[in-house]
């Protein structure tokens, strides 16, 4: 590895950060998939910076991004360094074996860099069928069958080509240093290792994550990852093509095909032909802000645009938070009722109409049409509607319903640099530990299970999100950039992990900042709530009992669960930038 003066400075900073890892984790003054396991609550008040801010899911990753900006790098440079470190220290959630959606504001335009995985050329709509029926969900997840062509490396390279300031190789140095010299297993990673029943069946993962007796390595154990360090050195010196062609690509393909019970069809040609795509951001207005995010294949911004389009006529500001458990603010029953009913309607439309727009016509303008949303919003009454039906927006094609579960392991990064460039990036390998296949020190995704397992619904209509060769599965990832509607000034960067619950985690946070006058950290801290067109989901242990009973009286089927969001964000304030991180996970923010 080239040891430049910049690289040496970054390496020293990262080693210092590694030594202080534990202290860094504390802040300054219908078909339902269970949320990712909780790992405790750490009170967080937010982090203040004047000139720039980095927020991410792990302190070591935040330190890497911070050092890049201090060295003169852009927000995109910092995001790349953060993601590479997350591959190492938060392997259950994201990494180079997965995909990413990266939203960039350069002061002129919102660009959407699409690094979503693609289905192999040999994939068919029978991929997840067995004996004429959809296979059990985890029978599809674990093994090579679920692995799509990873997109994160290509997406990072495309973003760097357009917006980077530092040399590509320099961005790899923090992750290489940590991989070679070691990092400490965090409590969250240790807890997830202890709960996962599949990962240890992979020999490479077992050797890395588990003791000789089969028990998971404990929190506080120092891990080195020389195999990943070697991969990162190769990518640093040879560029992204080295990931998609040659020995690294061949190793991925071999791993996918070698699974003893559930091999996949990913090929060397699939990897060599993968390209990240540059798309225009999708925006909608709410109150005094313009909210911008990702278009299809993401469903997140479109669903949020529908939800808030239906809520625009409601006086949500009057429905102030109530006193919750431990005296902390919590949304009122009426606010949860209105939001959750709007979310039911949006999810019904999402499940019917949204998929990869390169393969199916997504009626975006119709779904966001104000008259259509007014009609949909008028369906919200005093009592819960239960299961919502999809509407018929203008120019909508006939489509079948698809309620494919979307699993909750993902990571979010928000960064604003000294020049005002902003990044909102959500990255994922899909389920916790992805396909449970480890190759060269990193885990491969299981993103193909985000497709519908069936190609037709019960009425015989084609499902928009069915498996097709080369197609990108629908996502709920919702990286957002929020602007003042009149001045155009950037207000916030935010997003979250959480599978399809991402939409509600981010939606709750927008309600807090846009309607209730909360700062971003306060809004993130609110108990989570929402519906995915099934039961009304409320955060266990933090939602007031009176709120639960009122919702039940309104006809809501209530489910209390951990609701482990992982929101990160950056918000403009009078002092510069407020960094915010979810108290439900291990993230922090750091700026200057």
PLM regions: where:
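Bacterial N-terminal signal peptides that target proteins for export
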Residues: 1-8
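Noncatalytic scaffold domains of N-terminal-nucleophile
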Residues: 23-63, 67, 75-245, 250-295, ...
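Internal maturation/activation junctions in enzymes
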Residues: 32, 316-428, 437, 582
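Short, small/polar residue-rich loop motifs at catalytic or cofactor-binding pockets
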Residues: 278, 407-410, 475-477
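Extended C-terminal subregions enriched in glycine
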Residues: 470-472, 506, 515-562
């Amino acid at each position: 590895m080239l040891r430049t003066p910049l690289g040496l400075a970054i390496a020293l900073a990262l080693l210092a950060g590694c030594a202080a890892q534990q202290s860094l984790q504390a802040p300054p003054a219908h078909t339902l998939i269970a949320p990712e396991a909780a790992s405790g609550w750490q009170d967080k008040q937010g982090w203040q910076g004047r000139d720039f801010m980095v927020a991410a899911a792990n302190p070591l990753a935040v330190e890497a991004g911070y050092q890049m900006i201090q060295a003169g790098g852009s927000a995109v440079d910092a995001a790349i360094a953060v993601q590479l470190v997350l591959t190492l220290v938060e392997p259950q959630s994201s990494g180079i074996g997965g995909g990413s959606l990266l939203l960039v504001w350069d002061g002129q335009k919102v660009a959407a860099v699409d690094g979503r995985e693609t289905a192999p050329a040999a994939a068919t709509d029978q991929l997840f069928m067995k004996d004429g029926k959809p296979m059990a969900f985890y029978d599809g997840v674990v093994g090579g069958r679920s692995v799509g062509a990873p997109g994160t490396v290509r997406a990072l390279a495309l973003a760097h080509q357009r917006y980077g300031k530092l040399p590509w190789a320099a961005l790899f140095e923090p992750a290489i240093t940590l991989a070679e010299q070691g990092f400490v297993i965090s409590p969250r990673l240790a807890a997830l290792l202890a709960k996962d029943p599949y990962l240890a069946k992979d020999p490479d993962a077992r050797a890395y994550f588990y003791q000789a007796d089969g028990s998971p390595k404990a929190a506080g154990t120092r891990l080195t990852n020389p195999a990943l360090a070697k991969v990162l050195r190769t990518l640093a010196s040879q560029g992204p093509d080295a990931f998609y062609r040659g020995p690294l690509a061949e190793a991925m393909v071999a791993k996918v095909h070698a699974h003893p019970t559930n091999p996949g069809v990913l090929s060397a040609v699939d990897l060599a032909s993968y390209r990240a795509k540059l798309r225009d951001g999708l925006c909608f207005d709410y109150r005094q802000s313009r909210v911008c995010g990702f278009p299809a294949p993401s469903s997140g911004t479109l669903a949020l645009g529908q939800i808030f389009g239906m809520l625009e006529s409601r006086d949500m500001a009057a429905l102030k938070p109530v006193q919750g458990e431990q005296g902390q603010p919590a949304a009122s029953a009426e606010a949860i009722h209105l939001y959750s009913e709007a979310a039911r309607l949006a999810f019904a439309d999402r499940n019917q109409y949204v998929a990869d727009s390169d393969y199916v016509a997504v009626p975006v303008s119709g779904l966001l049409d104000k008259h259509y949303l007014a009609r949909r919003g008028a369906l919200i009454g005093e009592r819960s509607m239960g299961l919502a039906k999809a509407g018929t927006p203008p120019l909508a094609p006939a489509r079948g319903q698809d309620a494919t579960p979307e699993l909750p392991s993902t990571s979010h990064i928000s960064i604003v640099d000294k020049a005002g460039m902003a990044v909102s990036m959500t990255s994922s390998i899909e389920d916790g530990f992805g396909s449970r296949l480890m190759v060269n020190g990193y885990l491969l995704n299981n993103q193909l299970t985000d497709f519908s397992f069936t190609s037709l619904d019960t009425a015989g209509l084609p499902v928009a999100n069915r498996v097709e060769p080369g197609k990108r599965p629908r996502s709920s990832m919702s990286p957002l950039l929020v602007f003042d509607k009149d001045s155009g000034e950037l207000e916030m960067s935010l997003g979250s992990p959480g599978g399809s619950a991402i939409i509600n985690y981010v939606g709750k946070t927008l309600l807090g900042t846009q309607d209730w006058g909360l700062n971003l950290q306060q809004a993130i801290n609110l108990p989570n709530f929402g519906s995915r067109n099934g039961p009304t989901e409320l955060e266990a242990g933090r939602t007031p009992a009176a709120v639960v009973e009122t919702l039940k009286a309104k006809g809501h089927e209530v489910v209390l669960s951990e609701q482990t969001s992982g929101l990160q964000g950056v918000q403009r304030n009078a002092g510069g930038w407020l960094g915010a991180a979810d108290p439900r996970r291990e993230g922090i923010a750091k700026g200057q």
